Amino acid sequence: MPLLSLSWLGLGHTAASPWLLLLLVGASCLLAYILPQVYAVFENSRRLRRFPQPPPRNWLFGHLGLIQSSEEGLLYIQSLSRTFRDVCCWWVGPWHPVIRIFHPAFIKPVILAPASVAPKDRVFYRFLRPWLGDGLLLSTGDKWSRHRRMLTPAFHFNILKPYVKIFNDSTNIMHAKWQRLASQGSARLDMFEHISLMTLDSLQKCVFSFDSNCQEKPSEYITAILELSALVARRHQSLLLHVDLFYHLTRDGMRFRKACRLVHDFTDAVIRERRCTLPDQGGDDALKAKAKAKTLDFIDVLLLSKDEHGEALSDEDIRAEADTFMFGGHDTTASGLSWILYNLAKHPEYQERCRQEVRELLRDREPEEIEWDDLAQLPFLTMCIKESLRLHPPATAISRCCTQDIMLPDGRVIPKGVICRISIFGTHHNPAVWPDPEVYNPFRFDADNGKGRSPLAFIPFSAGPRNCIGQTFAMSEMKVALALTLLRFRVLPDDKEPRRKPELILRAEGGLWLRVEPLSAGAH
């Protein structure tokens, strides 16, 4: 083989061939990696020209930064759903397209696709992984499918039914605190603060059978969960903090790791203790025995769960699912219930009708307690809850990453590799889907008015194969807490209108403040 002279690089004739070969191999590998990427970008750009897009900031940033986590950001999303009605294309920088979807007909092929075709996008959810591990929220593929099958029995009504007593007790504790604070007539309260503690109180009892009395005194575990949620939301707002190496060096990163350790240690200790005390018998017999003795908690069900091959969950898997349930169950329910009270405070006529419905249901009942069978006997209260979840959905959007082309109903195609942003908020506020979408009108959810409406027009708990497994739990808790609250208190709006703030869930800047007035015993 003839040698090429590379003496100008300081290499002799004997070294020239190997260096040239190495250079050629390296360049070929680089081109083999880059060229398909470049081709995919240009091919996707060509195919995405069929999707309209709002005016970008500029060619470099695209639409990056146009939607902030603020009231103005939500108003911008509303304007997108009014303008485009179904979908639009959004560019994050010059290379990364996102398809935003606002219409049930266009949501359907994405959200109902198999989990392998449209898995959750990991860009944002990865911030939760050190805390939640491979639980249902973050796992994919066969592991997600296996866990989903194994966890479904944990949300059967036979398991949920005894939890209603816990919901009553936790709500009673919150109300006793409100009565003390309103002893002089009325109290101005941040609903998120009080209701978050109430939902966490219920969850600790339902998941771990542990009573931390967190509504009355500080709890390290509860404080850690609240801090983790706040830290993840704050990290999402800063692009610089998206870099793991940098984030771990910051004060927030150190606080995040410390809070994770505390939460994991608590969950691990409960699992170890329960492993020691769990009866060594068949799953069904153990479930029946524990059901007779006390309320089955989430850990019990996870420890007794077996897949179709008779394999149980590992302790690591159980911890991930328990931590996921604590995360997913407290914030979303607290957001939903807080905004429901806000909407009923703004519409006293609906509030009073709900109150009368509850009074009629509990007439002459002592003590005043909501039971499982009562939950189906509150139709108007349920309509008010659903309308609030439409107007103020706890989760404003969900993301999916297409692993293959997805055909939309009008023939357009979302290319493989493109992220889809399903806008729950935009769909719920789309005038093409909901007439007068900014008006709070519970009668939208009257059975007669819902005829002909797509089930995907209302998706506060998502939909499809990856919908919220705990939605019956959440709805039951909201019904109990709302019914008892309206029975005992009149809820009034604050002087200052709240500014909405979408983070992990839909919050209000500076808290969601309302006034509560205890109702006299005679008013009952």
Curated annotation (Swiss-Prot):
Annotated TM spans? 15-35
Location(s), subcellular: Endoplasmic reticulum membrane; Microsome membrane
Q: Which GO terms describe its biological process?
A: arachidonate metabolic process; fatty acid omega-oxidation; leukotriene B4 catabolic process; leukotriene B4 metabolic process; omega-hydroxylase P450 pathway
The name on file for this protein is: Cytochrome P450 4F3
| GO CC terms | endoplasmic reticulum membrane
What pathway, per the record? Answer: Lipid metabolism; leukotriene B4 degradation
Main location as per UniProt = endoplasmic reticulum
What catalytic activity is recorded? leukotriene B4 + reduced [NADPH--hemoprotein reductase] + O2 = 18-hydroxy-leukotriene B4 + oxidized [NADPH--hemoprotein reductase] + H2O + H(+); leukotriene B4 + reduced [NADPH--hemoprotein reductase] + O2 = 19-hydroxy-leukotriene B4 + oxidized [NADPH--hemoprotein reductase] + H2O + H(+)
Q: Where does heme bind?
A: 468
Q: Which UniProt keywords apply?
A: Endoplasmic reticulum, Heme, Iron, Lipid metabolism, Membrane, Metal-binding, Microsome, Monooxygenase, Oxidoreductase, Transmembrane, Transmembrane helix
Which GO molecular function terms does the record list?
Answer: arachidonate monooxygenase activity; heme binding; iron ion binding; leukotriene-B4 20-monooxygenase activity; long-chain fatty acid omega-1 hydroxylase activity; long-chain fatty acid omega-hydroxylase activity; very long-chain fatty acid omega-hydroxylase activity
Q: Name one Pfam family in it.
A: p450
The job of this chain, per UniProt, is described as:
A cytochrome P450 monooxygenase involved in the metabolism of the pro-inflammatory lipid mediator leukotriene B4 (LTB4). Hydroxylates at the omega-1 and omega-2 positions LTB4. This oxidation step leads to LTB4 inactivation, which is postulated to be a crucial part of the resolution of inflammation. Mechanistically, uses molecular oxygen inserting one oxygen atom into a substrate, and reducing the second into a water molecule, with two electrons provided by NADPH via cytochrome P450 reductase (CPR; NADPH-ferrihemoprotein reductase).
Which family is it part of? Belongs to the cytochrome P450 family.
Give cofactor(s), names only.
heme
Disulphide bridges: none
UniProt membrane topology term: Single-pass membrane protein
